[in-house]
């Protein structure tokens, strides 16, 4: 990487609370989830902050539980899900004009549902919208569990507005959490039958055949697992591939590695990004535990490989050279843009990176059409940069 010039920072700002995750909405605003620990009480709280693309704070929505992850629905990007340290997820609605040329000060964000999935001392580590089923949501937690829920809607059409109406009609109960009383909706989740032995940090829906009914999970037990989405039964696991916890997974999608439908990308605390060929998993085969992969490739990124975000479709079209690109948040080693190319001697190649301004754990990042936004935790750093 010595020959690669570090990318230039466009804008930088210090957030009020430590930023843990972020997403960019329609190339117009940056949504940031924050996580703060009160050491005197042990209570964790956070906020959903909204920034312009030049990092001016538009508004901040305080949450009684810290935010560990946030995602936008691929079916209606005005629907946000946030994962919290208090066993709950929250659904939010962005209200703005339907046109992409809206001004950032013309939008409004408000919570539409507070769903209690687990006990209040369980942290929800990640949340994921299904790429195939608009109502399906996947979560993981620090008790080692992964589960799905079905999002309620009163309309045939899946919209944030219809979801808000559906949850507004449900009874809320008083719930004692962190010394306060909050209004929540208790939701029964469909848990996968085989949990991880330690924290389940991440998960991913399969997208392409034959994995369209498979969910992959990664845990602090160094184990990568596959589960049947329909029956919730265990399919396959391996704890001999990674030398530390598995914290990020990326499956092939129509716009990402679509020529490798049986391959997944993983990231671990052991600093390595890996490509795993899982062709040994047939459509009706349950291989069991520690069955080796057909093939694996690895690259040391010099920091824990915490999060993957694939390049936007329009950027991939302009970048088109037979390779796929990921933004990788590398914890204590900043963020990197990594390409994957079958036509190269080295499958993984670092194309761009940013370390300056991220003197702490880089946990969150996303792309817009023109820039990348990343955040790091203990130094409260939010930055934008170009590649």
Swiss-Prot record:
SMART domains in the cross-refs: WD40
Describe the inactivation phenotype.
Answer: Accumulates diphthine, the last intermediate in the diphthamide biosynthesis pathway. Increases the interaction of DPH5 with elongation factor 2.
Stored InterPro entries: Diphthine_MTase, WD40/YVTN_repeat-like_dom_sf, WD40_repeat_dom_sf, WD40_rpt
Cite the EC number: 3.1.1.97
Keyword Kinase found = no
Q: Which reaction does it catalyse?
A: diphthine methyl ester-[translation elongation factor 2] + H2O = diphthine-[translation elongation factor 2] + methanol + H(+)
Keywords of this protein's UniProt record, alphabetized? Cytoplasm, Endosome, Hydrolase, Repeat, WD repeat
- Classify the main location: cytoplasm
In its keyword annotation, does this UniProt entry include Magnesium? no
Could you tell me which PANTHER family the record lists for this protein?
DIPHTHINE METHYLTRANSFERASE
Record note on quaternary structure = Interacts with CAN1 and RTT10.
Describe its function.
Catalyzes the demethylation of diphthine methyl ester to form diphthine, an intermediate in diphthamide biosynthesis, a post-translational modification of histidine which occurs in translation elongation factor 2 (EFT1 and EFT2). Also plays a role in the regulation of the retromer complex and is required for the recycling from endosomes of plasma membrane proteins like CAN1 and MUP1. Identified in a screen for mutants with decreased levels of rDNA transcription.
What name does this protein carry?
Answer: Diphthine methyltransferase
């Amino acid at each position: 990487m010595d020959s690669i010039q570090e990318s230039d920072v466009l804008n930088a700002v210090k957030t009020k609370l430590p930023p843990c995750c972020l997403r960019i909405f329609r190339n117009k605003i940056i949504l940031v989830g924050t996580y703060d620990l009160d050491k005197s009480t042990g209570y964790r709280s956070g906020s959903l902050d909204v920034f312009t693309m030049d990092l001016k704070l538009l508004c901040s929505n305080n949450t009684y539980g810290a935010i560990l992850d946030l995602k936008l629905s691929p079916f209606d990007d005005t629907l946000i899900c946030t994962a919290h340290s208090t066993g709950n997820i929250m659904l939010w609605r962005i209200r703005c004009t339907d046109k992409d040329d809206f001004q950032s000060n013309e939008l409004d964000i408000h919570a539409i549902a507070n769903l209690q999935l687990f006990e209040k001392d369980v942290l929800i580590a990640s949340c994921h919208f299904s790429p195939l089923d608009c109502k399906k949501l996947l979560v993981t937690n620090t008790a080692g569990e992964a589960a799905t829920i079905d999002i309620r809607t009163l309309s045939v059409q899946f919209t944030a507005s219809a979801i808000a109406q559906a949850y507004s009609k449900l009874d809320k109960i008083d719930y004692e959490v962190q010394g306060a009383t909050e209004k929540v909706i208790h939701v029964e989740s469909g848990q996968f039958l085989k949990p991880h032995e330690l924290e389940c940090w991440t998960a991913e829906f399969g997208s392409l055949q034959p994995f369209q009914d498979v969910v992959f999970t990664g845990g602090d037990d160094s184990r990568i697992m596959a589960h049947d989405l329909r029956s919730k039964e265990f399919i396959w696991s391996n704890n001999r591939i990674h030398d530390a916890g598995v914290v990020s997974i990326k499956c092939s999608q129509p716009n990402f590695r679509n020529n490798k439908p049986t391959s997944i990308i993983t990231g671990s605390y052991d600093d390595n990004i890996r490509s795993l060929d899982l062709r040994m998993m047939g459509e009706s085969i349950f291989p069991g535990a520690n069955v080796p992969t057909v093939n694996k490739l690895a690259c040391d990124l010099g920091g824990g490989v915490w999060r993957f975000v694939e390049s936007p479709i329009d950027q991939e079209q302009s970048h088109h050279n037979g390779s796929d690109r990921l933004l990788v948040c590398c914890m204590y080693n900043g963020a990197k843009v990594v390409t994957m190319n079958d036509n190269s001697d080295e499958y993984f190649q670092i194309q761009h990176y940013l370390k300056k301004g991220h003197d702490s754990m880089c946990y969150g990042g996303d792309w817009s059409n023109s820039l990348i936004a990343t955040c790091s935790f203990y130094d409260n750093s939010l930055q934008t940069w170009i590649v």
